[in-house]
């Protein structure tokens, strides 16, 4: 093989389809838009959800619920994620963000009981599940709601 014999991989270089260049191309005259009608016009297309004037599905279905403006979203941390800290560490929300366990604090941190804890830690968080609090205390650590 020589440099002038190099060719791109099959299918990696797709040729752009040029429309309106004669009937023989298969996309001449109307350029693949069919005859007349709204979708044949320039800029002419229907918005998403439009059903030709029929009452659209999203308006036929009843409204449900509301958005609680006071909703709090907690960053979730499981017990097995706390194993990355050394024995005797005081785990705070700031430390969890700094070490990359959670991206951001959100409205607070909630510790859940998935996995097992192998270290003795003092954990400070906004909320604890019952199983998480029990597991932390069982290892001789402490949990504190802040």
From Swiss-Prot:
GO terms for biological process: translation. Residues 23-35 have a biased composition (Gly residues). Keywords: Ribonucleoprotein, Ribosomal protein, RNA-binding, rRNA-binding. SUPFAM superfamilies: Ribosomal proteins L15p and L18e. It comes from the Bacteria. One of its GO terms (cellular component) is cytosolic large ribosomal subunit. GO terms for molecular function: rRNA binding; structural constituent of ribosome. InterPro entries: Ribosomal_uL15, Ribosomal_uL15/eL18, Ribosomal_uL15/eL18_sf, Ribosomal_uL15_bac-type, Ribosomal_uL15_CS. Residues 1-13 have a biased composition (Basic and acidic residues). It holds the Pfam family Ribosomal_L27A. NCBIfam families: rplO_bact. Part of the 50S ribosomal subunit. This is Large ribosomal subunit protein uL15. It comes from Staphylococcus saprophyticus subsp. saprophyticus (strain ATCC 15305 / DSM 20229 / NCIMB 8711 / NCTC 7292 / S-41). The gene is rplO.
